């Protein structure tokens, strides 16, 4: 498995996204973020489904093969603009998850 250097050691790519989420999100939003990531790509940063790419299956060719942090912040921006932010100024991943569930996509 490919690893990404972080600090003095190296970790698996999905751990990079998990670490970013852990530092940037409240526990509730991190939980919803992680459910979305697993459902969308099974935590596979190279996942492809038609014209959708990466952890979050975004419809942007820029995500194809993009580094973990780029994918994370791309989705951060997408969710913030589409579903709003919480009172802690973080993307509302739980609102995004609810939308996916209502549509039957989760």
Give the location of each predicted region:
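N-terminal prepro-regions of secreted/extracellular proteins
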Residues: 1-11
